[in-house]
UniProtKB/Swiss-Prot annotation:
Cited NCBIfam families: dapE_proteo, PRK13009.1
The protein's name in its UniProt record: Succinyl-diaminopimelate desuccinylase
Record's cofactor remark: Binds 2 Zn(2+) or Co(2+) ions per subunit.
Provenance organism: Burkholderia orbicola (strain MC0-3)
Pathway info: Amino-acid biosynthesis; L-lysine biosynthesis via DAP pathway; LL-2,6-diaminopimelate from (S)-tetrahydrodipicolinate (succinylase route): step 3/3
Length: 379
């Protein structure tokens, strides 16, 4: 069994459901410390974070390449639906099964073993290798990567490149990498009306009827046209509720939850202003609470994307696609202190599902790609 596969199985065997790390980071720390990494555990409200650094011969003047990821996994769902226990690694039909196999314990193992192989061949490497690992990515993400980033900002730590081990591939390893992500902003809208008897609408104000024209306009609005890297911004309703449950009472208020997924072609302030303008135009009496869970980030083609594309092509023969589709990731936090952030990991077809798995044939090539990037950028 390869070293990467063995470490992957060791990590899968830990039931590290958010935010419980279950000593996964301790396993990684022991391996990294043996290589000469300075390892720091940063705990916050039950979340375990790891910042590990191995300086190169150029010291703080050298380039720093960070591997970022998460040890936490999503809940298993109904255990009886799993073909084999989710935290007992199992091999069937050329696949390794277990919760976290694809998202993202194989990537973590590949990071570690790639670093071990790189240091063995390049003991006097010039640049710096770092690990930024959290147990709070699948959950609220309030005490994980963002806390480490804030600490590094306070220390004046500079990251030049970061690879986030998210499962970005689709059919084959390396067919898709993410060089950016859209931002996410949600709104909680309450439109006020006057509750009344449904037979006497002139004595009431039905907030559903009041909201409907504005809702239609919001749904039809083209917020932007996107750009070279991002599709157009989208606005979607996730929840709409009003009424008491009775058939003869008009509601006193209508509650609407909505979400923007927005590109670098729009700003938070601009989108908020346009929503308020539409609501005000329709004369609504309302309250609106905003929450921004992530700003868009983008890494244009450059040193990191070039090194990763070359490593993937050399290892797999595949020409990769740069993409910004999908949801948010911890890359949105890391982009605050790192100009080049790219996500790359194994195929994502089984993530968060019953019988999550990874094809064993992808495990060592993933490690090899990570090692090749180290060789290109910091050797």
């Amino acid at each position: 069994m390869s070293a990467t596969l063995a470490l992957t199985e060791q990590l899968i065997a830990r039931a590290s459901v958010t935010p419980d790390d279950q000593h996964c980071q301790q396993i990684m720390t022991e391996r990294l410390a043996a290589l000469g990494f300075e390892c720091e555990t940063i705990a916050s409200h039950g979340v375990t974070n790891l910042w590990a650094v191995k300086r190169g011969t150029d010291g703080r003047d050298g380039k720093l390449l960070a591997f970022a990821g998460h040890t936490d996994v999503v809940p298993t769902g109904p255990l009886e639906q799993w073909t084999s226990p989710p935290f007992i690694p199992a091999h069937r039909d050329g696949k390794l099964y277990g919760r976290g196999a694809a998202d993202m314990k194989t990537s973590l193992a590949a990071f570690v073993v790639a670093s071990e192989e790189f240091v063995a061949v390049h003991p006097d490497h010039r640049g710096t290798i770092a690990f930024l690992i959290t147990s709070d990515e699948e959950g609220p993400a309030t005490d994980g990567t963002v806390k480490v980033v804030e600490l590094l900002q306070a220390r004046g730590e500079r990251l030049d490149y970061c690879i986030v081990g998210e499962p970005t591939s689709t059919a084959e390893l390396g067919d898709v990498v993410k060089n950016g992500r859209r931002g996410s902003m949600s709104g909680e809208l309450v439109v006020k009306g006057v509750q009344g008897h449904i037979a006497y609408p002139h004595l009431a104000k039905n907030p559903i009827h009041l909201l409907a024209p504005a809702l239609a306009e919001l749904a039809a609005e083209q917020w932007d046209a996107g750009n070279e890297y991002f599709p157009p911004t989208t606005w979607q309703v996730s929840n709409l509720h009003a009424g008491t449950g009775a058939t003869n009472v008009t509601p006193g208020h209508a509650d609407l939850l909505f979400n923007f997924r927005f590109s670098t072609a729009s700003t938070v302030e601009g989108l908020q202003a346009r929503v308020h303008a539409i609501l005000d135009k329709h004369g609504l009496e309302y309250t609106l609470k905003w929450s921004v869970s992530g700003l868009p980030f983008l890494t244009p083609r450059g040193e990191l994307s070039g090194a990763l594309e070359h490593a993937i092509r050399t290892e797999t023969g595949i020409t990769t696609e740069l993409s910004t589709t999908g949801g948010t990731s911890d890359g949105r936090f890391i982009a605050r202190i790192c100009p080049q952030v790219i996500e790359f990991g194994p195929p994502n077809g089984s993530i968060h599902k019953i019988d999550e798995h990874i094809e064993v044939r992808f495990v060592d090539p993933l490690k090899n790609v990570y090692r090749r990037v180290l060789e290109q950028l910091i050797a």
